[in-house]
Amino acid sequence: TKSMPTVFNFENVKTVPYNKNEYYVLYEAASGYSTLTWSSGNQGFALTGSGYTPNDFPTSISPNGRTGNCLQLITRKTGSLGTLVGMPIAAGNLFIGSFDIGSAMSDALSATKFGTTFYYEPIKLVGYYKYKAGPEFYENGESTNRKDVFNIYALFYEKTKDVQMLDGHIAKNNYEHENMVAAAVITDTHETSEW
């Protein structure tokens, strides 16, 4: 079986029960490739309440894609538990790697582990999106006058004995790390209602 697929459609989804909730896990299955299971912080959001349906989560799908389904990322309030631990909101996210639920409450950025082995030389990242900023921007649990922006990026790095995976701190470090080989970061993050 080859490496992971290089075309992603967000058409394959399974529902996962956790903490009296159900959320979506997306995966890519293409003939001749290993199945790629996407990761998100949905498992962490599931700790904030019960009775959530998959579409209540920050990371879900919508049937209103350019063709077929699309990924839907929404920032959600985390309720009293999230406020208690200093994490009053949860942003929708999707990444290749894993989410360490054991670290989620104490260090959310470390809980996000990016990466999988990729055997090709990357040339470009192409995709489609729609984006609308939420009506309020929260910082430290308080509404501010700032406006939200989104981010899309692909990071390629060399795995070594000391660095097996990069984590969520990479964004705070301006997407720079000594093991980085290449990065593609979207620069035009304007709101648009068209694909």
PLM region descriptions:
Residues 131-147, 160-163:
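Extended, low-complexity, turn-rich repeat/linker tracts enriched in Gly/Pro/Ser/Thr and Asp/Glu
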Residues 2-124, 147-157, 164-195:
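Aromatic (Trp/Tyr/Phe) and Gly/Pro-enriched flexible surface segments
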Residues 121-133:
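A short beta-strand element within beta-rich, extracytoplasmic domains
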